[in-house]
Curated annotation (Swiss-Prot):
Primary role: Nuclear serine protease which mediates apoptosis.
Name the record gives this protein: Pro-apoptotic serine protease nma111
Superkingdom to which the source organism belongs: Eukaryota
Cellular compartment(s): Nucleus
Stated family: Belongs to the peptidase S1C family.
InterPro entries, alphabetized: PDZ (IPR001478), PDZ-like_dom (IPR025926), PDZ_6 (IPR041489), PDZ_sf (IPR036034), Peptidase_S1_PA (IPR009003), Peptidase_S1C (IPR001940)
GO cellular component: nucleus
Assigned EC number: 3.4.21.-
Residues covered by region (Disordered): 1-49, 983-1028
CDD domains attached to this UniProt entry: cpPDZ1_ScNma111-like, PDZ2-4_Nma111p-like
Matching SUPFAM superfamilies: PDZ domain-like, Trypsin-like serine proteases
Source organism per UniProt: Aspergillus niger (strain ATCC MYA-4892 / CBS 513.88 / FGSC A1513)
Compositionally biased tracts (Acidic residues): 1012-1028
Comp. bias intervals (Basic and acidic residues): 990-1001
């Protein structure tokens, strides 16, 4: 007899694999061999990114062998009732994360249009989907019932929508399931359109399988057979030779064993009959989980021989009895039943099966039942009030400050044997992204006020102003012994709406309503603080530089520019304390659609804004209000001379625990590098820079810091550089390198003067060539001699590796670099150092002397303005984040197909379901060209809701294709983020549904959670731990 707790069980739901999932970006093969001139930094650190591999792919598929004529005739009729269900759970809810998937169902009422499938297909939360019949007719489906416990649900479709085939329904005959019966499982196995798998029923009295932390069925027996079904077969009918459905495919083993688990159809048949009659499907509970235990185990628990004899005489074929497994605290049976009680009678009726117990409880909601159990050989009779199972199953949720919340469900309570009470975080995002876990938190209090249920939580959140920092107390459902306490930053500006969603079983949708407008932020108050003092540090300069460091935390409400994270924390260097200017790595502040918090002296937290983003050299300049900081912040003194190889220096950095470390060391090398491009999704990277490495192991452990001299002058910044994502493990590489401060000074001086630097750059990426290579490529001996004299420490020139795709409006007739050009001079200045390329910043055109194909030539090379390189607009449509191709895209592509670039997409959205993947360009909507976001917005606004439309797209590798997408304005309304300096956050959010959102503010839906988005075609969302 199997007990509950089958670790190898897996539900048969397939991840979506539509034909629209085309190759979007070819990964380069990983190799340790460097390309010519490659100077990739060698000290990259790899960070784990979750790899969600579908274990169901490991299952063998067991197709049916040649069938008899009777079986063939049966199957021909059955397949006309089987449908392929393609669906999304549009946001995380209860045990399920937002996702897109496909499964199977079958028609059980052709006249009224009812389809039976699994509960984990119908989804506990918002569902959106359609079904495809055997003749490939498509029809929308909506949920009309999902059972609170058992793994079945009922969908409804419009029978009139099926015009080209006669609808057939399968008769449910649960009593036909017998041990030894030959069966067929007819469904979409492994995502295929139709698979027919054969098997033989081996057991009828198996306990329901446990699927782990997610949804699991209980309080029912399951049927076991060997059919080797795989992902996508969830909801398949299990039919006998008479063509009757005798069970419902639900799950199986994921360890390679050809074992499948079927749900008996007794309770689905009752629910269907209630729905047909227009009656509610009543479900009763005493909040107790029962399991089947064989008689030998029951005897050990205290079943007396007399009662065993009575049971065996009354039910000669039975070999097991029901035993209490879990009694929930504060439930009707709490303090009355105990674990291990053997159930004998309910209301005076002897029973040994779940079906009869369910029948009694479902017909006794609100009434009292009498239970007779044996406990240690003693008869114990108790009375329990039967509760309503639907009342403890969440049918509403609230989204606020980026997170999604509902009352704790009976499913979760049963799994962890806790009371069905509390506020459950089903989408831990935005302000409520706690300890880097996406869901599973129970919020005990917010702002020192208890939140025992969702209503109390809403009342507390109504009173908290925007940008407030409040204390929350919480526990994770998997570790209720440990209570966590955190300070969270309440975001009601990126997420202004507090919205209530309520399930509507009449429409199959969840109805949204606004609960409260945000309270404006309180004016900031100046604070006092002192910096720590380093004990035992022999270098006075290191002790002094502490006053120039601040901690920078950047939170992004939306994934843009291919950046993989929603939050990043590190340290910045104060370069002007009077003006509040801080230099920080661009791997921490990648773009300005963000919230930046600066922590001074580990005590004062102030907001900051982006002042400048360098397009090439991996630093950002941010600014906080210094009047709010009453602390002895010190402006760092920056060196004006470049640090040299072999020079002694003091390394001051911050380790992974954000603790300061100091080491006296020396510069080992200064190498011209470009951070490797990310193949799966272009994102910002530093190019054409001199990277400094030092002789200390601390350098690899610290992502931020400085190199300083004995006089306390900062010789270099120590920055983290976001690198590529490895194709095998889907892990991001981060490099830690030094950046000489003299390269920072020209830009910084302009910012200090209140002038916004308007840099111009050369539209290319270069790498170093040595003189041996240069000679072979046609550089004359005269020039080689000049190089050796101009740069005695490094005899090198620069070769053009890649010419960026020019921005719109660029003069295509102008001279440009070509790949392979060797640059000798720019405006007459010999170029042998990266810093000498800075001449490009101020000039519209440069006269370049180059060697091309072995010949020297002069060309007039135009520079490119950087004002348009940063993203200033994003359109969110059907769950896809669309933007103008950012700089990293232009660096890696040779031709821009349009200015509508897919930057990211949300799980559970139409873009995810239909395969509109990141790194694609959209060139037309319904045949109308859409060269830019304005034209795109204009065309898609004409499309009615719930209607298919065609998108012509081009992959990053120039492969054109067409994808059809169905619009969904209810769950994924179109909205925009537009840069607007008049707004406090620098951006404003606009809704395109003016009738529905008259205030123009886009709805704050859980599907805009950046942690639920993927920015690369590999589909991996970043969940790297970011300790606070």
């Amino acid at each position: 007899m199997d007990l509950n707790g089958d670790a190898g069980a897996k539900r048969k739901r397939s991840s979506i694999t539509t034909p629209a999932e085309r190759p979007v970006k070819h990964l380069r093969p990983e190799s340790s061999a460097l390309t010519p001139g490659d100077s990739t930094p060698a000290n990259g650190t790899v960070y784990d990114v979750e790899d969600d591999e579908d274990a169901s792919r490991l299952l063998p598929v067991g197709p049916a062998q040649a069938d008899s004529p009777e079986w063939q005739a049966t199957i021909e009729e059955v397949v006309k009732s089987v449908v392929s269900i393609h669906f999304c759970q549009t946001c995380s809810f209860d045990t399920e994360l937002s996702m897109s998937s496909q499964a199977t169902g079958f028609v059980v009422d052709a006249e009224n249009g009812y389809i039976l499938t699994n509960r984990h297909v119908v989804c506990p939360g918002p569902f959106w989907g359609y079904c495809i019949f055997d003749n490939h007719e498509e029809c929308d489906v909506r949920p009309v019932y999902r059972d609170p416990v058992h793994d079945f649900g009922i969908l409804k479709f419009d029978p009139k929508a099926i015009r080209y085939m006669k609808l057939r329904e399968l008769k449910l005959q649960p009593d036909a399931a017998k041990v030894g019966s030959e069966i067929r499982v007819v469904g979409n196995d492994a995502g295929e359109k139709l698979s027919i798998l054969s098997g033989v029923i081996s057991r009828l009295d198996r306990n329901a399988p446990e699927y782990g932390d997610g949804y699991s069925d209980f309080n029912t027996n399951y049927i076991q057979a060997a059919a080797a079904a795989s992902g996508g077969s969830s909801g398949s009918p299990v039919v006998n030779i008479d063509g009757h459905a005798i069970a419902l495919q639900a799950g199986g083993r994921a360890d390679g064993a050809a074992t499948d688990y079927f749900l008996p159809l007794d309770r689905p048949l009752r629910a269907l009959e209630c729905i047909r009659r227009g009656e509610p499907v009543t479900r009763g509970t005493i909040q107790t989980q029962w399991i089947l235990k064989p008689f030998d185990e029951c005897r050990r628990l205290g079943l007396t021989p007399e009662w065993e004899a009575t049971v065996r005489k009354a039910a000669p074929t039975e070999t097991s009895m029901l035993v209490a497994e879990i009694i929930l605290p504060e439930g009707p049976a709490d303090g009355k039943l105990e674990e291990g009680d053997v159930l004998l009678q309910v209301n005076g009726v002897l029973l040994t099966q779940f079906i009869r117990l369910d029948d009694i409880l479902d017909s006794s909601v609100g009434q009292t039942v009498r239970l007779l159990v044996q406990r240690g050989g003693q008869n114990v009779e108790i009375e329990c009030q039967v509760g309503d199972l639907h009342a403890i199953t969440p049918d509403r949720f609230v989204t606020v400050a980026g997170g999604t919340f509902h009352n704790l469900s009976y499913q979760q309570s049963r799994l962890y044997a806790i009371a069905t009470r509390g506020v459950y975080v089903c989408e831990a995002a935005g302000s409520f992204k706690l300890e880097n876990t996406l869901s599973g938190w129970i919020i005990d209090s917010v702002d020192k006020r208890p939140t025992r249920n969702l209503d109390e939580f809403v009342e507390v959140m109504r009173t908290i102003p925007d940008r407030s920092r409040v204390v929350i107390s919480y526990r994770h459902i998997r570790d209720l012994h440990t209570r966590g306490t955190s300070i969270v930053y309440i975001d009601r500006h990126w997420h202004p709406k507090m919205r209530l969603a309520v399930r509507n079983d009449d429409t199959g949708l969840w109805d949204f309503s606004d609960l409260a407008d945000p309270i404006p932020a309180l004016p900031p108050v100046p604070r006092k603080a002192d910096f720590i003092q380093l004990d035992g540090v022999s270098q006075p300069a290191a002790a002094d530089i502490v006053r120039s460091f601040v901690r920078v935390s950047c939170t992004m409400p939306l994934k843009l520019d291919g950046y993989p994270q929603a939050k990043k924390t590190g340290f910045g260097l104060v370069v002007d304390a009077e003006k509040g200017l801080v230099v920080v790595s661009r791997a921490i502040v990648p773009y300005d659609l963000c919230d930046i918090n600066v922590t001074v002296a580990d005590s004062i937290i102030v907001n900051a804004k982006v002042v400048f983003l360098h397009p090439l050299q991996n630093y950002s300049i941010i600014q906080y209000d210094p009047s709010l900081v009453q602390a002895p912040v010190q402006s760092a003194k920056l060196a004006t001379d470049y640090i040299k190889q072999g020079q002694d220096t003091i390394f001051v950095g911050f380790n992974q625990n954000f603790r300061i470390v100091v080491a006296k060391t020396a510069v080992t090398d200064i190498t011209t590098v470009s951070i490797p491009a990310n193949a799966s999704a272009p994102r910002y990277r530093a190019i054409n820079l001199d990277a400094i490495t030092v002789d200390t192991g601390l350098s690899g452990q610290c992502s931020n810091g400085v190199l300083i001299g004995e006089d306390g002058v900062v010789q270099a910044l120590w920055l983290n550089y976001l690198g590529e994502r490895t194709s095998n493990s889907h892990k991001d590489v981060e490099y830690h390198l030094g950046f000489a401060t003299p390269s920072l000074l020209p830009v910084l001086s302009k910012v200090q003067q209140g002038e916004m630097p308007e840099l111009r750059i050369l539209n290319m990426e270069s790498y170093v060539v040595q003189m041996s290579q240069a000679r072979i490529m046609g550089v004359s001996e005269e020039w080689i001699e000049k190089v050796t004299q101009a740069n005695p420490s490094r005899h090198q020139l620069f070769m053009v590796r890649k010419v960026d795709c020019p921005p719109p409006g660029f003069n295509s007739a102008a001279d440009t670099f070509e790949e392979g050009d060797i640059i000798l001079t720019l405006d007459g200045q010999l170029i042998t150092r990266v810093s000498e390329l800075d001449i490009m910043y101020e000039k519209d055109t440069l006269e370049a002397l180059i060697v091309r194909n072995g010949q020297e030539m002069r060309i007039q090379v135009p520079t490119v303005p950087t004002e348009d390189l940063e993203t200033d607009r994003a359109v969110v449509f059907c769950g896809a984040v669309l933007q103008k191709p950012h700089h990293a895209v232009r660096q890696q592509i040779s031709k821009l197909h349009s200015e509508v670039y897919v930057s990211a997409r949300s799980r559970g959205s139409p873009s995810y379901q239909y395969g509109l993947a990141p790194t694609n360009f959209i060139t037309a909507v319904n045949g109308v060209p859409t060269p830019n976001l304005d034209r795109f917005s204009e065309e898609v606004s004409k499309i009615p809701d719930n209607t298919y439309f065609r998108l012509r797209a081009v992959t990053f590798d120039n492969v054109p294709w067409v994808v059809t997408v169905k619009k969904n304005d209810h769950y994924f309304p179109m909205s925009e983020y537009i840069k607007d300096q008049s707004q406090p956050s620098g951006w404003r959010t606009v809704s395109h549904d003016k009738d529905k959102y008259k205030d123009g503010i886009a709805p704050d839906a859980a599907n805009l959670n950046p942690d639920a988005m993927d920015e690369g075609f590999d589909g991996v969302s970043d969940i790297e731990p970011d300790l606070e």
